[in-house]
């Protein structure tokens, strides 16, 4: 399996850790961001990101905004996540 540089974006530290631990065990390099604004800063600085795993609901800049901004610049694959369930 190809080793990837993956940006994991989630305001919940437990979710970031869960995703990071799993992917690092597979040999991937993980970069973490706590919100959309930090994710965009990291994305601009790292042109070799292979995948973005992105929470939908975050403060400052949500996942949809990040997705639109990234899509305007790149075709990097994006996986959108949410922990929100039906009540």
Predicted regions and their residues:
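Conserved phosphotransfer cores of two-component systems
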Residues: 44-47, 69-76
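Charged docking surfaces used in two-component/phosphorelay signaling
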Residues: 17-25
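Active-site residues of response regulator receiver
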Residues: 55, 82
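Active-site beta3 strand of CheY-like receiver
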Residues: 47-53
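Receiver (REC) domain active-site loop signature in two-component systems and cognate sites
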Residues: 58
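Acidic catalytic/metal-coordinating carboxylates
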Residues: 35-38, 62-65
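Conserved sequence signature across two-component system core domains
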Residues: 9-10, 33, 52
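Short hydrophobic/Thr-rich beta-strand motif most characteristic of the beta2 strand and flanking loop
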Residues: 27-34, 42
